[in-house]
């Protein structure tokens, strides 16, 4: 049995295969996920797990060099990301553009978060 890290086998597998500049998305409960993109649905209940809970676990194993989020996202949402990834580069685009970009991600992790626009695309970085 695995002792540390991410215990969700699907998330662990996806992170392990990411290369530099590959992208994954973490999205809220209502985000439309393209049918051709791998969906990892971890919703447990309305509101659970939150975006932040999922982000914290993912950051244990993933080096992130850029976060793409919607202009419509709240300042609080942006602050959550800044607190968890202090020196990350941000790219802000429209929510419609963000939805289109999810066509090119390796996987989408669907959370139970119900705060509008709690969606981000994480761009994989390098550890050296």
Swiss-Prot record:
Q: Which residues form the active site?
A: 20
What biological-process terms (Gene Ontology) are attached?
D-ribose catabolic process
Q: Which EC class, in a word?
A: isomerase
Write down the EC number.
5.4.99.62
What is the superkingdom listed in this entry's lineage? Answer: Bacteria
Task: Say yes or no: keyword Nuclease present.
Answer: no
Q: Which residues, by range, are in coiled-coil regions? A: none
**What function does this protein fulfil?**
Catalyzes the interconversion of beta-pyran and beta-furan forms of D-ribose.
The family note in this entry says: Belongs to the RbsD / FucU family. RbsD subfamily.
Protein name, please? D-ribose pyranase
Q: Which gene encodes it?
A: rbsD
């Amino acid at each position: 049995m695995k002792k540390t890290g991410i215990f969700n086998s699907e998330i662990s597998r996806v992170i392990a295969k990411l290369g530099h500049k590959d992208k994954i998305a973490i999205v809220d409960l209502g985000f439309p996920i393209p049918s051709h993109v791998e969906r990892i649905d971890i919703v447990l209940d309305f509101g659970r797990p939150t975006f932040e809970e999922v982000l914290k676990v993912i950051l244990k194993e993933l080096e992130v060099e850029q976060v793409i989020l919607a202009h419509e996202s709240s300042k609080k949402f942006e602050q959550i990301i800044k607190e968890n990834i202090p020196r990350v580069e941000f790219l802000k685009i429209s929510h419609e553009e963000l939805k289109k970009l999810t066509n090119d991600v390796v996987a989408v992790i669907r959370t139970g978060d119900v705060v509008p626009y709690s969606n981000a695309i994480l761009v994989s970085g390098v550890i050296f």
